[in-house]
Amino acid sequence: MTINYQFGDVDAHGAMIRAQAGSLEAEHQAIISDVLTASDFWGGAGSAACQGFITQLGRNFQVIYEQANAHGQKVQAAGNNMAQTDSAVGSSWA
């Protein structure tokens, strides 16, 4: 009986998570553009309130990026560890 695991799928999933984290920058910039378009709400683009909102938004996106990227790395590492363990166990049974 042969059991086949698709460790490449796990690695690809981790890579996808990391790619999605990377694409957050485009979303961040689009939101900043919308905020600046509606900057009158905060008293103008140069106002402390508007700039404070943009700064906080940037911090939030940075945290999300870092967490998503780290999670993707962990998924890839787990897939790699499983593949190595499977290979070691499989070769010991041969």
From Swiss-Prot:
GO CC entries: extracellular region; peptidoglycan-based cell wall
Intracellular or extracellular location(s): Secreted
Record bears the keyword Thylakoid: no
Function: Probable virulence factor. In mice, elicits increased levels of IFN-gamma, IL-12 and IgG(2a), indicating a dominant Th1 host immune response.
Miscellaneous field: Potent T-cell antigen that could be a subunit vaccine candidate.
Quaternary assembly: Forms a tight 1:1 complex with EsxW. The complex is destabilized at low pH. Unfolding of the proteins is required for dissociation of the complex and membrane binding.
Family: Belongs to the WXG100 family. ESAT-6 subfamily.
Protein name: ESAT-6-like protein EsxV
Species this chain originates from: Mycobacterium tuberculosis (strain ATCC 25618 / H37Rv)
